[in-house]
Design a protein with these regions (language model features):
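Sequence-structural signature of mature extracellular/luminal beta-sheet repeat domains
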Residues: 1-256
Length: 256
């Protein structure tokens, strides 16, 4: 198992003007500066509005976010919103595009946002592209693997070669928003040029976050199997980040 040293910055500060930062590489200290601060710019006490995504669209100067699940008239709901800076203040606007059921992670794609749509008990999820301006038209990019519906697509990243990499755990089933899984929990790569969709890595409990290194030679995938969709936590299961070189295409050789 790999190990890494880290530094803790501002461990005692808990106010909105201070923050605690775990620094695994000294280069990050240059980004933080001598007196790093965390500032609360928006807050919503009615529901957990800022849970996933966090996609900045430079053309509109807006950040797109997705909420965690909450109840609306007794039914589970996830809200898509966009944050825009107005002078020294920030405003949040709820947006309800068609065709993005239970949105979760997202990434910049083309001129807009590529959402992970987890799906519903009766409709499949997948990857859905949304234009960033009204009327927020959407287009399904993927919604199945070899004819079988995805479990509940969770997070996504786009490589500079145009390929789309994403994770597909079973959280939707455990949270009772998706039917019983038809596929294992794996990492996929979709070649947008050829249409080829393949499994890049398996053996995960619940593959979750995914990201590339700046040079794109490495991909990082978190496995959050310890956190059950029903809220229970099992410390005997994986709470791990895996790393794999992308140079071993078409498959990944992951390590901790």
């Amino acid at each position: 198992m790999g190990t890494s040293s880290f530094s803790v910055i501002n461990p005692e500060q808990t106010s909105s003007s201070g923050g605690c930062f775990l620094v695994f590489k000294d280069e990050f200290l240059d980004l933080l500066g001598p007196e790093p601060e965390i500032e609360v710019i928006l807050e919503n006490k009615n529901y957990p509005f800022a849970h996933e995504a966090g996609v900045l669209i430079l053309a509109t100067n807006e950040v797109w976010i997705t909420s965690n699940q909450y109840l609306v008239e007794g039914k589970k709901h996830i809200q898509i919103s966009k944050i825009k800076r107005e002078g020294s203040k920030f405003a949040c606007e709820e947006v309800n595009p068609d065709g993005v059921p239970y949105a979760n992670g997202a990434v910049n794609y083309k001129d807009g946002v590529l959402f992970c749509a987890q799906g519903t008990p009766t409709s499949p999820g997948g990857l859905v592209y949304m234009e960033p301006r009204p009327p927020y038209r959407t287009e399904v990019v993927l919604n199945n693997y070899l004819g079988r519906s995805f479990n509940s697509v969770n997070d996504v990243v786009v490589h500079s070669d145009g390929s789309i990499w994403f994770t597909d755990p079973v959280y939707g089933f455990e949270q009772k928003i998706r039917p019983r899984p038809m596929l294992p929990s794996v990492v996929y790569r979709f070649d947008t040029a050829s249409g080829d969709l393949r499994v890049m890595a398996d053996g995960f409990g619940k593959p979750n976050g995914i990201s590339f290194s700046p040079d794109e030679k490495t991909v990082y995938v978190t496995d959050t199997a310890a956190q059950h969709g029903g809220g229970e936590f099992d410390s005997a299961r994986a709470a791990t980040m895996y790393v794999a070189p992308t140079t071993h295409f078409p498959f990944l050789r992951k390590s901790i």
